[in-house]
Amino acid sequence: MPARPRILFVAEAVTLAHLARPAALAACLDPARYDARIACADAARRFLGAGAAQAEPLRSIAAASFAQRLAAGQPVYTLAELRDYVTDDLALFDRVQPELVVGDFRLSLSVSARLAGVPYLAISNAYWSPWAADRSLPLPVLPWTRWVPLALAQRGFDLVRPLVLAPHCRPLQRLRRAHGLPPLPADLRQVYTDADRVLYADDAALFPLGDDAPPQHRHLGPVPWSPPLPLPPWWTELPAGQDLAYVTMGSSGPAQALPLLVAALRGLGLGVVVATAGAPLPAPGAGVWAADYLPGELAAARARIVVCNGGAPTAQQALAAGAPVLGVCSNMDQFLHMRGLAAHGLGRALRADRLGAPAIAAAAAALLAAPRPAPRPAPALRERFTPHVDALLAARAAPARTATPPLAPAATAR
């Protein structure tokens, strides 16, 4: 093994979250000990910052295509796309020569890392684990769900769920079979978390695993990240004495809901700070400040309430600052995350297909009236992540690899 083992982080930049976590993890490694590289689509590089790990080019499907398929309830990848991904992955490995690959939603690594004989560590969320304590799946927003009573729609979804989710598993299963790899269990959660080791970027107290979880599946804890972009000129003009709401739908939320959200929050007397992620927003009126992107940790720290799509990245920024979360959820990932927060009194979820000003105002007012949550800052990332890297590197350096390498100390999970 070289003096500085090369760790390749592979970011599937279909949403900003799947770039953010690899970028934060690559940045946390000691550069004197590790040669960290990050592979991502060219369009995502602007979010890495000047001091980031060396970037390597890698194709991803268009974020818009991913979002459209997700909203329609279709498989997010075709077999042909995953086949091309494997070709690109193997060319990347040949060029970079990594000792360890760390992936975030790059499903093709289930095949390509095994073909290359490179240890593969996957970053995911605990509510997607096959061994999550709560393994039920909520009904996402689909083209037909707004027209059906919700309780009836959920019961129907529960009955047909295996049939509905099977097509989402099929492309990767066929790809594995084509390369002589054994099939995975017929479970979307298995498809999302197949790796030599899986680390869950969640607070273990909020999203526990069951007692039957295997040793290679463990919590890492939250992975904080904000885009390394300058603050807008108006940032210093925010009124110190006014309660603020921080609103962002991110890269995977219903951007069309922004005007409705802003109006409802202004109706509660809140100032509103908005990160639009590039979505159009009517000219802000008094008490509204907008930018394409903001450092979410700073915005959440200024906010009395955070309104987002319910996904982990922004919600974790809110929790770290002690701000309650109002999640406007569309896809299953967002509903799963907000279910965990709501169960602990840290937030409320609204469905994007049943969104209206009265519901927004009522949910926000209830969160504002409740006691403010205690801040939940994430422990130092380097100390949590490095032991897992070292364990996998040590296993690869051993003459024979016969078992899953030992885990990092349990203290690495929050």
Segments from the language model and where they lie:
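Short, basic, glycine/proline-bearing loop/turn elements
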Residues: 11, 72-78, 93, 168-176, ...
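Structural motif
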Residues: 12-13, 41, 201-203, 249-252
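Donor-nucleotide binding loops and adjacent catalytic segments primarily
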Residues: 26-27, 46, 205-305
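Flexible loop residues that form catalytic
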Residues: 106, 203-204, 250, 311
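Active-site-proximal region of nucleotide-activated glycan assembly enzymes
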Residues: 121-208, 214
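C-terminal intrinsically disordered extensions
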Residues: 189-232, 389-414
